[in-house]
Curated annotation (Swiss-Prot):
<dbReference type="GO" id="GO:0005634">
    <property type="term" value="C:nucleus"/>
</dbReference>
<keyword id="KW-0238">DNA-binding</keyword>
<feature type="compositionally biased region" description="Basic and acidic residues">
    <location>
        <begin position="540"/>
        <end position="550"/>
    </location>
</feature>
<dbReference type="InterPro" id="IPR009071">
    <property type="entry name" value="HMG_box_dom"/>
</dbReference>
<dbReference type="GO" id="GO:0003677">
    <property type="term" value="F:DNA binding"/>
</dbReference>
<feature type="region of interest" description="Disordered">
    <location>
        <begin position="170"/>
        <end position="633"/>
    </location>
</feature>
<feature type="compositionally biased region" description="Basic and acidic residues">
    <location>
        <begin position="478"/>
        <end position="491"/>
    </location>
</feature>
<feature type="compositionally biased region" description="Basic and acidic residues">
    <location>
        <begin position="353"/>
        <end position="374"/>
    </location>
</feature>
<feature type="compositionally biased region" description="Basic residues">
    <location>
        <begin position="174"/>
        <end position="190"/>
    </location>
</feature>
<feature type="compositionally biased region" description="Low complexity">
    <location>
        <begin position="212"/>
        <end position="224"/>
    </location>
</feature>
<feature type="compositionally biased region" description="Low complexity">
    <location>
        <begin position="253"/>
        <end position="271"/>
    </location>
</feature>
<feature type="compositionally biased region" description="Basic residues">
    <location>
        <begin position="272"/>
        <end position="309"/>
    </location>
</feature>
<dbReference type="InterPro" id="IPR051762">
    <property type="entry name" value="UBF1"/>
</dbReference>
<dbReference type="GO" id="GO:0005694">
    <property type="term" value="C:chromosome"/>
</dbReference>
<feature type="DNA-binding region" description="HMG box 2">
    <location>
        <begin position="96"/>
        <end position="164"/>
    </location>
</feature>
<feature type="compositionally biased region" description="Basic and acidic residues">
    <location>
        <begin position="559"/>
        <end position="612"/>
    </location>
</feature>
<feature type="compositionally biased region" description="Low complexity">
    <location>
        <begin position="406"/>
        <end position="416"/>
    </location>
</feature>
Length: 633
């Protein structure tokens, strides 16, 4: 419902009753009126028969169909989105479809049969076979399919007419809306990228226009004020000029009237009455002249003022037009200059701000870099201090371990020499009980003392070898500790907690390593002492047995042992001491050869004596060979 100017405010249709009970209640309300009771109506509804309920159901269905048609008509004619918010939109039903042709009917009926016959073939080949069979069918069978098609087609036409009458226009509108929406979406997608770039330029241009409009408004207001002031001045000037012109003309007219009056008075007056006539004429002429001049001056001044005002108005209008045009041009020039100045000033401000921001960013970045360098330097100096402290600690620990190893080696050598002397005294005391073997062993006794002296020299050499081996193990331990330190530094960068744990672990590792090294060195020194004691005993026995057979074998065996290379002065001292010890041992052996005899002892006793000697060496008893070994190390 549309008019020339406005649309009618059509209200949406109301929903009808949706149940049979509601339809029954409406009928009773219309019939009973004021005497309506809910309880009685409910009882009557429960007593209704099936036929009456079917009648009410038909009423409900018809009411729903009418409501849908009215609502659809309302939605097609209404305008404005605000009203469509509370109105539910009715969906347009689909078009009625055309029926299937005769060939497709034949396919629907016989497709399964052909598929069961030809299982190995594809669908395309099966369709070819069916089309050939359909073309070969007789006309009677083909007419059956065509008649069914024509009946359904007649029904289709009737349904399509009904649908087109109700929903044809709405369906066309929806199709056009969909097409427009798709085209708009494509255009928006294509222009989306350009709109982003144009939006920025539009925003800047709109700002410039606003600035120019503000400046133009100010200039127009100032020009209008100037025009008002100039018009008021022109009006005042015209009034003052008209007054001046009237005054000057009045004076001229008065002078001419005086002359005329004087000449006329001379002609008319006689000689007798010259004085009286002249005085009277003067007074009358002056009064008349004044009156006539004032009246004439006023008329002339009014007419002239009108003409002058018109001419001045024309001139002023033309001058105003010229001024307005010039002022408009000047305003435009001023606006353009103000725009240029503003744009240049805004650009300069923006550029200055951007430069200030860049400078501030550069300053902050420099400050951050300086702080980072300071932190790095402080961290590197701290790491260097820590590494120097650790190296000092490790050197102190190594010196302590060296001292402990030297002490343990010296004690072991001294305990070995004393244990040998005690074992020899015990063996001599037992030699008196044994008879036959004493003579043979007494003969080999002086050489056993020499062998002991030679073994003592070998002990010193072995102790020096142990010292060299300990130095090698220490260097390896240092290398391992350095590797551990490097690994700890790399791990310390990962986390502060890892640093603390790594430091504690390195300290515990260094302590455990130093303790384990000291233990190993002590155990090595103990083993060396026991091995030397066993070797001396075995060598003394072998010498006593092989004295008669090969006296030079022992000397060859002794020469096989490699001694460490030392200085010539140390060698001479050792040789002199060994020779003096041999001489003393030979003298003692000659004096005691008859009384003292060596006896064979079990290995278990020897081991027990060795253990006693080790204990005494730990207690701190030192000998000559032990002091010498410590000096060399």
């Amino acid at each position: 419902m549309e008019l020339r100017t406005k649309t009618l405010n059509i209200q949406p249709p109301k929903k009808p009753f949706s149940n049979t009970y509601q339809a029954f209640v409406l009928e009773k309300k219309n019939a009973l009126g004021k005497n309506f009771d809910n309880k009685k109506v409910q009882a009557d509804y429960n007593k209704l028969s099936n036929n009456e309920k079917e009648r009410l159901q038909k009423l409900v269905d018809n009411a729903e169909e009418k409501y849908k048609e009215e609502l659809f008509h309302y939605n097609n004619h209404i305008q404005g989105k605000g009203k469509q918010k509370y109105v539910p939109q009715v969906k347009v039903p689909e078009k009625p479809k055309k029926p299937i042709g005769s060939f497709f009917r034949f396919l629907e009926e016989n497709r399964q049969k052909y598929a069961a016959k030809h299982k190995d073939l594809t669908n395309a080949k099966i369709l070819k076979i069916m089309s050939e069979d359909f073309n070969n069918l007789p006309q009677k069978e083909v007419k059956v399919y065509e008649d069914a098609y024509q009946k359904e087609y007649a029904q289709y036409l009737v349904e399509f007419k009904k649908w087109n009458e109700k929903y044809g226009q709405a369906a066309q509108k929806k199709q056009t809306k969909r097409k427009n929406s798709t085209s708009k979406s494509r255009r928006s997608s294509s222009k989306g990228k350009s709109s982003v770039s144009k939006g920025r330029t539009k925003s800047t241009s709109s700002k410039r226009r606003a600035d120019s409009s503000a400046s133009q408004g100010r200039s127009q207001s100032s020009s209008s004020n100037r025009r008002k002031a100039s018009s008021s001045k022109d009006q005042k000037g015209t009034r003052s000029s008209s007054r001046k012109a009237s005054n000057s003309k009045g004076r001229k007219n008065s002078t001419s009237n005086k002359r005329n009056s004087s000449s006329s008075s001379k002609r008319s007056s006689s000689s007798k009455n010259k004085k009286s006539s002249s005085s009277k004429n003067k007074k009358s002429s002056s009064s008349k002249g004044r009156k006539s001049s004032s009246s004439r001056g006023r008329k002339a001044s009014s007419s002239k003022n009108r003409k002058s005002s018109k001419s001045k108005d024309r001139k002023s209008s033309s001058s105003k037009g010229r001024k307005s045009s010039s002022s408009s041009k000047s305003n435009k020039r001023k606006a353009s200059s103000s725009r240029g100045r503003k744009s240049s000033s805004s650009k300069g401000r923006k550029s200055s701000k951007s430069q200030e921001r860049k400078n501030s960013h550069a300053d902050t970045s420099k400050q951050m870099e300086d702080e980072g360098q300071k932190r790095r330097q402080s961290s590197s100096s701290a790491k260097r201090d820590e590494s120097s402290k650790k190296s000092r600690r490790n050197s102190m620990k190594e010196a302590r371990t060296k001292k402990a190893n030297n002490k343990s080696a010296s004690k072991a050598s001294k305990s070995g020499s004393k244990s040998k002397g005690k074992s020899a005294s015990k063996s001599k005391g037992k030699s008196s009980s044994k008879g036959k073997n004493s003579k043979s062993r007494s003969a080999s006794k002086p050489k056993s003392n020499a062998a002991q002296n030679s073994n003592n020299t070998h002990q010193t050499a072995d102790s020096s070898e142990n010292a060299s081996s300990t130095t090698q193990t220490r260097t390896r331990g240092r290398q391992r500790e350095q590797k551990d330190m490097v690994n700890e530094k790399s791990n310390s960068k990962s986390s502060s907690k890892g640093k603390k744990n790594s430091k504690s672990n390195t300290r515990s590792k260094s302590k455990s390593k130093s303790a384990s090294k000291s233990r190993k060195n002590a155990s090595k020194s103990k083993k060396d002492t026991t091995n030397h004691g066993r070797q001396t005993r075995s060598k003394s026995r072998s010498e006593s047995k092989s004295k008669s057979e090969a006296p030079n074998k022992n000397s060859n065996k002794m020469e096989v042992i490699e001694q460490p290379k030392e200085e010539s002065s140390d060698r001479k001292r050792r040789e002199s001491r060994s020779q003096s010890a041999k001489k003393t041992s030979d003298k003692k052996s000659k004096n005691r050869s008859d009384s003292k005899k060596m006896t064979a002892e079990d290995p278990k006793k020897n081991n027990a004596e060795d253990s006693k000697g080790k204990k005494k060496s730990k207690e701190g008893k030192t000998g000559a060979y032990g002091k010498k070994a410590n000096k060399k190390q």
